[in-house]
């Protein structure tokens, strides 16, 4: 009984996700990923007497990995300069020079959502729908006429948008409580953001296209192909760790309008596969390798007691806290031999309470 013994086991499934990430164990009543920052539950998790919890989080690891794999030098320059990629994209997107997290928090959050989702070929309808429910844990957001005008959307654009049957069908699939006109404005603003991302991120678009071609060339036909640290083979993609992401029984099927769509078996269901999804899988899998390498280095000195997303948690003697913070930082941003030149960044902090470890 946890209440009596005091220790909290954190049940994780190794390679629980298809990309290799850890997941909460099936049947577990504890999922650390669901503990919100500042919550009482998060703050109730404590290090043993005389110790602290050191938490280190790899910042924006997925956009950094994607930038390297796609040779997106413009984004890499932002990272190398220590800049804020979300604010930089937001400034470009909304034409607000010098914007930052404090001056324009809503616009920056929109840019963050776009950068994280659009990088994996997210379409405007999915982006619009996810914004309405809260993209990646952010507060729900619906773009207004003011936002649309800032993005260059005109009344004529709205009328033209509503005259296309395909757009109406996509809109009807989006759960909403606003009027159809308001939803159309929101969708057009979302589309403008997606379009601007793609126009400004041609290396990423080219990488999607490469991954799309490799679905047939390598994953289906079995012709081996290596791109940087990733190797494509018959129904599998080999990560830098040597582990494989698998796509069993991959085959072409007919989609809407006779278009060829690729699907693979996932248990009893078929799952679609396309360039953007392959990109997502590769980036998440490679980011997991970078994270795991850092964890293995840290574990040589301090015991790890958990990992949440791109964060590790170690137990450290209280008197070593400051030195441990510096040391953990160094282990997490150490050079990555299979991603030469990737500019890593990490935030590290400590406290006896987990919820206060990073401020």
Roles of regions detected by a PLM:
Residues 1-101, 203-311, 325-332:
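Acidic, glycine-rich two-metal-ion catalytic cores of nucleic acid-processing enzymes
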Residues 21-22, 63-64, 315-317, 353-359:
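Short, solvent-exposed polar/charged micro-motifs at secondary-structure junctions
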Residues 57-58, 124-130, 139, 147-148, ...:
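Catalytic palm active-site di-aspartate
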Residues 89, 110-126, 240, 317:
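Core structural elements
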Residues 103-114, 302-303:
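Alpha-helical scaffolds flanking conserved acidic
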Residues 117-214:
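Extended, well-ordered alpha-helical scaffold/bundle regions in very large, multi-domain proteins
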Residues 189-213, 319-359:
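Polymerase palm active-site segment centered on the conserved acidic dipeptide of motif C
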């Amino acid at each position: 009984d946890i209440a009596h013994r005091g220790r909290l086991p954190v049940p994780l499934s190794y390679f629980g996700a298809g990309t290799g990430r850890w997941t909460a164990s099936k049947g577990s009543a504890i999922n650390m990923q669901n503990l919100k920052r500042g919550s009482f539950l998060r703050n109730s998790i404590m290090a043993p007497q005389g110790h602290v919890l050191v938490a280190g989080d790899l910042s924006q690891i997925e956009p950094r990995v994607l930038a390297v794999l796609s040779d997106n030098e413009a984004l890499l320059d932002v990272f190398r300069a220590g800049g804020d990629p979300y604010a930089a994209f937001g400034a470009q997107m909304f034409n607000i020079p010098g914007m930052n997290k404090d001056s324009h928090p809503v616009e920056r959050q929109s840019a963050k959502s776009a950068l994280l989702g659009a990088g994996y070929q997210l379409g405007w309808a999915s982006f619009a729908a996810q914004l309405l429910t809260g993209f990646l844990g952010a507060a729900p957001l619906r773009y207004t006429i003011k936002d649309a005008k800032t993005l260059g959307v005109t009344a004529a654009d709205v009328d033209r948008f509503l005259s296309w049957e395909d757009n109406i069908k996509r809109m009807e699939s989006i759960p909403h409580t606003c009027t159809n006109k308001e939803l159309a404005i929101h969708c057009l603003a979302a589309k403008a953001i997606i379009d601007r991302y793609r126009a400004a991120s041609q290396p990423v678009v080219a990488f999607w296209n490469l991954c799309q071609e490799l679905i047939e060339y390598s994953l289906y036909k079995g012709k081996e192909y290596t791109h940087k640290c990733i190797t494509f083979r018959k129904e599998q993609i080999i990560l830098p760790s040597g582990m494989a992401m698998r796509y069993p029984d991959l085959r072409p099927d007919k989609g809407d309008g006779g278009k060829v769509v690729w699907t693979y078996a996932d248990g009893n269901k078929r799952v679609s596969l396309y360039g953007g999804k392959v990109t997502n899988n590769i980036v998440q899998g490679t980011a997991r390798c970078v994270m795991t390498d850092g964890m293995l280095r840290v574990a040589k000195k301090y015991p790890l007691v958990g990992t949440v997303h791109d964060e590790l948690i170690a137990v450290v003697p209280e008197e070593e806290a400051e030195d441990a913070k510096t040391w953990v930082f160094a282990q997490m941003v150490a050079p990555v031999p299979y991603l030469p030149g990737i500019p890593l960044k990490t935030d590290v902090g400590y406290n006896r309470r987990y919820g206060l470890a990073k401020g």
